[in-house]
Amino acid sequence: MTTDTIVAQATAPGRGGVGIIRISGDLATNVATAIIGHVPKTRYAEYCDFNNADGQVIDQGIALFFKGPNSFTGEDVLELQGHGGQIVLDMLIKRVMEIDGIRIARPGEFSEQAFMNDKLDLTQAEAIADLIDATSEQAAKSALQSLQGEFSKEVHELVDQVTNLRLYVEAAIDFPDEEVDFLSDGKIANALYKIISKLDTVQASAKQGSIIREGMKVVIAGRPNAGKSSLLNALAGKESAIVTEIAGTTRDVLREHIHLDGMPLHIIDTAGLRDTLDTVEQIGIERAWAEIASADRVLFMVDGTTTDAVNPHEIWPDFIDRLPAKLGVTVVRNKADLTGETLDKTEEQGSCVYRISAKTGLGIDELKQHLKSLMGYQSNLEGGFIARRRHLEALELAANHLQLGKEQLEVYLAGELLAEELRMTQMALSEITGKFTSDDLLGKIFGSFCIGK
């Protein structure tokens, strides 16, 4: 770990009422002595002059000193809060850099130092960037929950449970005389099932947190001429897709990225699904299924003039049967302006059914509200947190190892292999909080931060 003293502007570049220069490291006290003549009293705001090497005043403002380890980074930290003109702030940084042993901080280096000094874990460090980058009130609240340790707490509880079970299994293997039938007495199985159930709950919360942060991927799918491209245009509020009465007009994937009350939504329009001999259209249909496989939600577009059915399994059973098992489906019955259907929401076989007219805009607002609710808009956030794609991947890896461990227990009664799967589960979960994390991943995470954070 570096022992350099670092400096950076902590406020956004440009003109503002207040600008903050942050210094962290062993030489922070030297900076204070050089610029304001003394080291301020710890955790007290002091109004003073900021001087250059000749004793001339560069600016006037507030100096704050935090003695390590009781600071954000865990090191000595000095903050100089002056006027927010960029020239003034540049002059202050230049003055600080005149002191030997100080360099400009890399992006995210203050947060990285805090992580290295155990002031916060990796999910909390990531939450700082997520809070800054939040595009909605929901995202900001969720990021704050993660910053306060909600996500970390859930992961630590899982790690503790897995560790305890692993230690029990390994101890029973090492001392078989004391626990002859330990693999078949039900105790290990019950503990393992509880861990799997707990992980399922955390995965569901993390999935929701990822949608709040990164947006929900919604794929519009259905037969040709059902109105899929018209719906894309209606949701996007512009003519993104060509709309004609010719079946198979859309042959490739079309994407629109929009925000609903600040929450990101990624809408994918796909080629109409049917049997065809047209090579180009076949490629488009293959791409449509590839998009469906990675979707968070499918809008199953139905031409309401062709069927009265509302149950998705009755409308097109082959399509529904081919969808991923956990993929949610919203049935969208289009052309309500022609069928005269009431624009109400119903539930059929676990799927929401909406009636709209993509052409006239009838029911589009209600469908948008539905999509916002799926993203967690204005939902109860107590215990909620923000999550990233890497978190979901780590949780999925942990879940896979637990399932393999369950198989080793139930089918083979293989204690050693169960213990190994529990160890791999520990490793996967510990990647989330940064207990076991590669330097390359740390560099990628902190390198995406703002300079000064």
UniProtKB/Swiss-Prot annotation:
GO BP field: tRNA methylation; tRNA wobble uridine modification
Chief location category: cytoplasm
Binding site for K(+): N225, T244, I246, T249
One Pfam assignment: MnmE_helical
Disulphide bridges: none
Chain sites annotated for binding Mg(2+): S229, T250
Residues in TrmE-type G domain copies: 215-376
Family: Belongs to the TRAFAC class TrmE-Era-EngA-EngB-Septin-like GTPase superfamily. TrmE GTPase family.
Role, per record: Exhibits a very high intrinsic GTPase hydrolysis rate. Involved in the addition of a carboxymethylaminomethyl (cmnm) group at the wobble position (U34) of certain tRNAs, forming tRNA-cmnm(5)s(2)U34.
Protein name per its UniProtKB record: tRNA modification GTPase MnmE
Organism of provenance: Shewanella frigidimarina (strain NCIMB 400)
